[in-house]
Amino acid sequence: MNELQRVQFEILCEFITVCKKLDLQYYLICGSALGAEKYKGFIPWDDDIDVALPRSDYLRFIEEGQKLLPDYYFLQNCKTDKNYHHFCSKIRDSRTTYVESDQKNINMHHGVFIDIIPLDLLPDDKHFSIKYRFFRICQLIHLKSPETYKNIIKFVLRPFVPISVVYSVFEKYLNKYSSKTLSEYCNFHNAKNNRLYMHKDIYGKGINAVFEGKDVVIPERIDEYLTLYYDDWRAELPEEQKAGHHYYEVLDLERPYTDYIEKTTHNGRRMKLRKTKKSIG
């Protein structure tokens, strides 16, 4: 694994330790599950780690996980970092810097991270789909766009759509289903709707796998999971598709992200970025 992957792997190991202490069900998902099954570790060109927990376990991790993690790890979500506007949580390494290109002007924690995603038991019906689309629109208003005109529109709309209120209302809606007998898990972090829902039996109790020499848990019906997610997951990708999907503005595995923040008299704190990008090889 490369140096970035090594830092992410260390975070994963601490995450697993906390899950074991709290007796929480977790799964490696998405490319991390594919990596465990196909490569016994990272997909060689992958640049992130994704893990998921059923919502009840996710909420317990959010509530109790921080105090069980090393002091240099920060459990980031919209409640612990007011400028973080994503549905999932992250564990970030405060000793490092990883500023993604689309977040370079956002004053939030910018350490190297892994994603922690809740799996929600929810009905697959028209009314819920409408509510979900409304939530996504509200969320996107608070995220940067490549196009300048979209950012101007979003800037005008933001005061009328406070993200903390949106998250609070939607989370209450999600929580009311967490104890009900439903058959579908929903991964809201996945933007591709055809992969949004999967039967919870596909995840099941999980099965053991090896990831870079570490025992991990992946979905129980892993072949079915990966087939639904990637179609022919055993096939080799063309060389031009062998690339990560995160684009960084600054990557520094030896200095904390706070070294890249400066104070200004008019705008409070803002990101101060180096002109060159550091290699992760």
Region roles according to the model:
Residues 52-62, 265-267:
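Short, basic, helix/turn surface patches
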Residues 1-7, 45-52:
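The substrate-binding groove and active-site-proximal loops of carbohydrate-active enzymes
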Residues 1-20, 65-124, 143-146, 154-231, ...:
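Conserved catalytic core of two-metal-ion nucleotidyltransferases
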